[in-house]
Amino acid sequence: MGSNAAAPAHNRNQTSQILQVYNHFFLIDCGEGTQMLLKKHKVKLSKIQCIFISHLHGDHYYGLIGLISTMHLYGRTESLKLYGPPGLGEIISIQLKHSNTSLNFDIDLKEWTPGVSEILYENDKIYIETFPMDHRIACSGFLFKEKPLKKKILKEKLPTDILPSQIAQLKKGNDVINGSGKVLYKCDDYTAEPRKSLSYAYCSDTKYTEDILSSIREVDLLYHEATFLEDMADRADLTFHSTASQAAKIARKAKVGKLILGHFSTRYRDLDPVLDEARKVFKESYLGVEGEDFILIE
């Protein structure tokens, strides 16, 4: 959705992303104007089940109370899961209190622990884990990782009298064994290996740090901030941000599949130099452009 840094500029908005995993929609960060972008790109607010806030700099969460208020206005009743840094709950409570707003729905808030990795969310398909960024205030990255998939059943090979419970065992990778220990159906005879589980890592505001490599190693898709070009590396270090080449260096060292660049400084109207700089280090680098999809599997 949004890909700019501190302020909107050059038809680029502040940070926000929608990640769809199966039928689950996750909003990652919520900069100013996010709800307008969701409407523009036809993402129904009712589909958003979880929101993840990386840190409490305004360009990453100033759109949150407006989005929550609109969800209320539209009659939402389903609970909203909200994950963010310490202090986010207090901010939301104050905003609702002083606007005399009593929401139609519950906010299930969990504030993550700064400086450590922890699992925030888990369902039968994926889990979502935090990992620390190196920024001026408490800031977290998020790893979205698909759980190992079950074996693919070769339906054409299944006996007609096999039971559903026995098929379930084969999917789990188990041989089907009767009460006396005899193998009735060998898993390898009736199944094929599933595709590789997919993963996405979101690296919000951070200076260059290799401490994150263990958390993002070999992910299929990596988003990493690229606020500056390399000629402003000193400025990047001073403000706890990264350059495009530094983001690409992290992608290369972590052996990721593809890199999305974002969080661009307002000083850059033309982003071609940002992309060129990154691709000199890591070929599979791409600009985070509003409305553009990065699809890992159809």
Residue ranges and their predicted role:
Residues M1-H41, K47, S79, F142-F144, ...:
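Conserved beta-strand hairpin/beta-sheet module of binuclear metal-dependent hydrolase folds
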Residues H10, Y121-Y202, T206-S215, L221-Y223:
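Active-site-proximal loop/helix segment associated with metal-binding centers of metalloenzymes
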Residues E32-Y83, E111-T113:
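Active-site metal-binding motif and surrounding structural segment of the metallo-beta-lactamase
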